[in-house]
Amino acid sequence: MSKIIGIDLGTTNSCVAIMDGGSVKIIENSEGDRTTPSIIAYPKDSEEVLVGQAAKRQAVTNPENTLYAIKRLIGRRFEEDAVQKDIDLVPYKIVKADNGDAWVKVKNKKMAAPEISAKVIGKMKKTAEDYLGEEVTEAVITVPAYFNDSQRQATKDAGKIAGLNVKRIINEPTAAALAYGVDKVKGDKTVVVYDLGGGTFDVSIIEMEDIDGEKHFEVLSTNGDTFLGGEDFDQRMIGYLVDEFKKDQGVDLTNDPMALQRLKEAAEKAKIELSSSEQTEVNLPYVTADASGPKHLNIKITRAKLESLVEDLLKRTIEPCKTALKDADLSTGDIDEVILVGGQTRMPKVTKMVQNFFDKEPKKDVNPDEAVAMGAAIQAGVLGGDVKDVLLLDVTPLSLGIETMGGVMTKLIEKNTTIPTNASQIFSTAADNQSAVTVHVLQGEREISSANKSLGQFNLEGINSAPKGQPQIEVTLDIDSDGILNVSAKDKNTGKKQSITIKASSGLSDEEVEKMVKDAEAHADEDQKFQKLVTSKNMADALIHSTKQTLDELKDEISIDEKSVIEASITDLEKVIKSDNKEAIDTKVKTLSEKAQLLAEKAQAKAGVKNTPQEEKNSDDVVDADFEEVKDDK
């Protein structure tokens, strides 16, 4: 049975881990890194798709086709405020899909966020397969605890498109708690996981208990903001640099995508440096040019300045902490330990602020970049039978219900209810002789239906004619272990039972997902062909170089005719190497190799002549020797 892998699909970076011999192993990617940038690029002059570090390296010269922070779009509608805000901040195009979702447009092709995220998941899958030496087909994938149903379903779709059966969706703070608690916590403890990542913020309060040798992890409450993270901190820094440059040089860099991409990289680097230094310098020569000539950016920035730029963002993380405590019916004094997760928590101001709020020094013995993937691997181990005596009880982050008369949301499942769970309630008709009812499913905390997230709606038809209020329609909401919702309805008066599938108001249809799965498989073949073509071209280049070098070294050893034949073969190969015809390249490589065999023979003969006198001299110097073994008496 193949391993179930654990994947942390992050906004900025992603990570993959497995259970290996009873412990968690973070798997290094092909570049030797333990985390992979969640960046996908489509080069202008190639059909190749770049993922990770390769995509990040070319971002400056290809900003409009380099996609990052796609997780912030997954499962979102184009009209949402968070999406509209992002449109002005990213160099690539965010467009409205036919179903109303937020998609991106790259090289004149519209693409769904799950389809793009699948490329990153695919890279994680390949990383695990290279390490294990076998195909991987199953995974546990993490999501922010505050992700709604649409975002969770979209993440599962991304896994499916990447060729994985997603066995479980697990909340990121819960995963981090697993990574921390399985080995490091003894006895019963109540911990807070404060997770400030690249694009999302979550806080969860988790009770860890040892019950008859079994570790129980029960989430008491969770809260957060799915559009708050390190990317927003970077944007504040970019905004400051743009303003300072405009004051100094009178040039607005926001109109220059290439300059903005350079600024983004520099801002991220400066932010990281300010976690360990009080001051840093952003130096970008030739950042842009105008009629007067090239312009250079050179700006010093202090840690205090960065803290002032992001002060309101930091404060935004405290309100969810207060709400989580209130929902769990706890105070800060009830918290035993605080765990920091997510790269942005390396900022000293974050640590200080969290410490002041909870009145406890946060634990630093968890790697904030790797803890979530480690927890996902532990959950994968539980599902695969590799990990025993661990029980995880998670919660739904938002309330679920349906719209009732007057545009009111009637909640059937309250937020922070332990999952899996289900709830049923009897509803009726609003008019006499009503033969059908529309069930509108909602997720959120507001009383007004329109202020909540619409998950979809369906019609229950064939209701018998009766006065209003008489028919009894039982609506059941069922949440599985992934936090994904299924809805059913039954007319109790007739006994007729109907299975209802919600026609989602957003998201990908089964047909679209299947098409994307097939596209991904087709591209996998294309990618493999491309890799083989590159290998052939590299071999051809190397052969041309070595043959030319040997020709020059042996110019006095070969005839003009021999030289002409070899040079003609080199020219033929140089011509065909410009094409994408692998078979033609391989044929010409074989021809040149055969022709160059003459050179190899002459080179060996020449080397033999040079070595003979030395070899003879060496043989004269050989004498027998007696060896005495010296024993060490130590």
Curated annotation (Swiss-Prot):
Keyword Phosphoprotein: yes
Stored InterPro entries: ATPase_NBD, Chaperone_DnaK, Heat_shock_70_CS, HSP70_C_sf, HSP70_peptide-bd_sf, Hsp_70_fam
Entries under PROSITE patterns matching the protein: HSP70_1, HSP70_2, HSP70_3
S-S pairs: none
Pfam (any one): HSP70
Acidic residues biased stretches: 621-634
Modified residue annotations for Phosphothreonine: T200
Induction of the gene: By stress conditions e.g. heat shock.
UniProt KW Iron keyword: no
Region (Disordered): 604-634
Keywords: ATP-binding, Chaperone, Nucleotide-binding, Phosphoprotein, Stress response
Molecular function terms from GO: ATP binding; ATP-dependent protein folding chaperone; unfolded protein binding
Annotated TM spans: none
CDD domains per the UniProt record, alphabetical: ASKHA_NBD_HSP70_DnaK-like
Similarity section: Belongs to the heat shock protein 70 family.
Function: Acts as a chaperone.
Name the UniProt record assigns to this protein: Chaperone protein DnaK
Organism: Vesicomyosocius okutanii subsp. Calyptogena okutanii (strain HA)
